[in-house]
Structure formats: C-alpha cells, structure tokens
UniProtKB/Swiss-Prot annotation:
UniProt family annotation: Belongs to the UPF0232 family.
Region annotation Disordered: where it falls in the sequence: 1-81
Amino acid composition bias (Basic and acidic residues), ranges on this chain: 30-52
Start-end of Acidic residues biased regions: 1-14
Superkingdom, taxonomy of origin: Bacteria
InterPro entries: DciA-like, UPF0232_actinobac
The protein's name: UPF0232 protein MSMEG_0004/MSMEI_0006
HAMAP family: UPF0232
Length: 194
C-alpha cells in the first residue's frame, strides 16, 4: 500500500544532517528551544524586532477578572489629550518638526508678523531657511527691507530659531509691454504710478 507522498518524499536511506557540536548533547524540545534562541539572538544583532511568536486573543478567566478603575481627579495618561499636543508629539516622534515649523511660518503669517504687514506682503516660498516675501508695491518692499531684522526676530520667537535664517523681499512683478521679437530697454519697472 502506497501513500500520496511516497513518490515525492525523500528516500528513507537519506542521511540526516548532524547538529553542530555545541548542540550535539541536546535532544527533542531542548534542541528546538536552543536553536530558536540562537535565531532570535542573530535577528537582534541585525537590529530586527524579535517577538514571542503569535499570541491569541487575551483569555479571561472567570475568577481573575480585574475591575476597571476610574482615572481619579488628577491628571492621568488615560485622560483626553489636546489635539495640538498630540499632533506636536506625533510630529516630534516622526521627525516632522522642521517641516511643520516651515509650514507654520507660511500658514500663520498674519499671526507671526501682524495685520499691517500681512495686508501688504505675502510669503511665497521657504527653501533652505530663505523665506521669499512678495510685497504689493516697491514702497512696501523697501519698508520691509528696513525692518527685516525685526521680522526675523518675530518669526524666530513664534516658530523657533533656525527655521528662517534670511528674508528675500521682492516687489511686485510689473506689467510687461513687450511685444514682438525685438525689444528696446524701457525706464525700468513701473509698478506704481505716482
């Protein structure tokens, strides 16, 4: 009588490989445990996360039920957390803090620099610590260049040092009267008429 695996399986006379010398004295489950410990140690040395295998759902035994307790009047880890604090912790743990700070400069521009400046100037880009600010007129661009150090101090106070290192203040892009293939230089940018 033949089974379904008789034709495909290894031959009965094939030699079984001997265990290494340091495992030669172990048999059965002890050999398996020792081999598993060595495999886990090798995985840990490579920086891999080593678990205890799959665990099933937690079993509740009738006599060992633990009563749920209230958190009490003091602060506790189970208390509801503020959304801002949780997202800030998430950004720190994931290494997003620098990107979040850069985004907050542009997103909170009005709160950072004040209403008067925000009405006349908008941030357009922040690349490698250089914040590009576009003013609505050349007069406002000149005014912003004069108070540039105060603006950098305000930005550093709100979002932290090192996020914005320099300001690049540009005036508005003037209208172009250039038509055709050939061009003669004009009087310069004409963004304000008077």
């Amino acid at each position: 009588m033949t089974g379904p695996f008789d034709d495909d399986g290894p031959e009965e006379d094939a030699p079984v490989p001997a265990p290494p010398d340091h495992l030669a004295g172990l048999r059965g489950i002890d050999l398996v445990r020792r081999t598993l410990e060595e495999a886990r140690g090798a995985a840990r040395s490579q920086g891999k996360d080593v678990g205890r295998g799959r665990s099933g759902p937690a079993r509740r035994v009738g006599g060992n039920r633990r009563r749920r307790t209230w958190s009490g009047p003091g602060p506790d880890a189970r208390d509801p957390q503020l959304l801002g604090a949780v997202t800030q912790d998430l950004a720190k743990s994931r290494g997003w803090s620098a990107r979040v700070a850069e985004g907050s400069v542009i997103g909170r521009w009005r709160a950072v620099v004040g209403d008067q400046i925000a009405d006349h100037a908008t941030p357009t880009a922040l690349n490698e610590g250089v914040l590009t600010v576009t003013a609505e007129s050349t007069a406002w661009a000149t005014q912003l260049r004069m108070v540039q150090s105060q603006l950098l101090a305000k930005i550093a106070a709100v979002v932290g040092d090192g996020v914005v290192t320099t300001l690049k203040i540009v005036g508005p892009a003037g209208p172009s009267w250039r038509k055709g293939r050939y061009h003669v230089s004009g009087r310069g940018p004409r963004d304000t008429y008077g």
